């Protein structure tokens, strides 16, 4: 794990990508020592955009599938429709919106903000015509709202 930690700190997205295979073969508890680096690799893309977005997405999937609460926080940050980073938030949102399905009702506290994001997407230059994404977002919001049995999320720090 020491090598994986160093690789995830590498600014090259291509190098970071080599670590993502661990997400499929190890448990969150086993990866706890490198969890800060996993989260940081989601937050800050490497300079190789082609690979770094894939690394970020795989990190989000790992956290979502394992009910890690920090993953929901990162997902909210990534899909924020911030015009200052339009090529990231607007472009990346259609790729990652589906991961809210793992959080379902545990994301209810985020519904007001998600509705604001949805309205912003409807008027954005980049996503206003992306009907598939807008429909998917509506389905996700309905799923979150109607979920009567939300999953129990846990922080990676308590693993």
Positions of the model-derived regions?
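Amphipathic alpha-helical scaffolding segments comprising HEAT/armadillo-like alpha-solenoid repeats
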Residues: 1-9, 28-45, 68-82, 105-119, ...
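Structural detector for internal amphipathic alpha-helices that build alpha-solenoid repeat scaffolds
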Residues: 6-9, 13-29, 49-68, 87-106, ...
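Eukaryotic acidic, Ser/Thr-rich intrinsically disordered low-complexity regions
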Residues: 115-118, 122-159
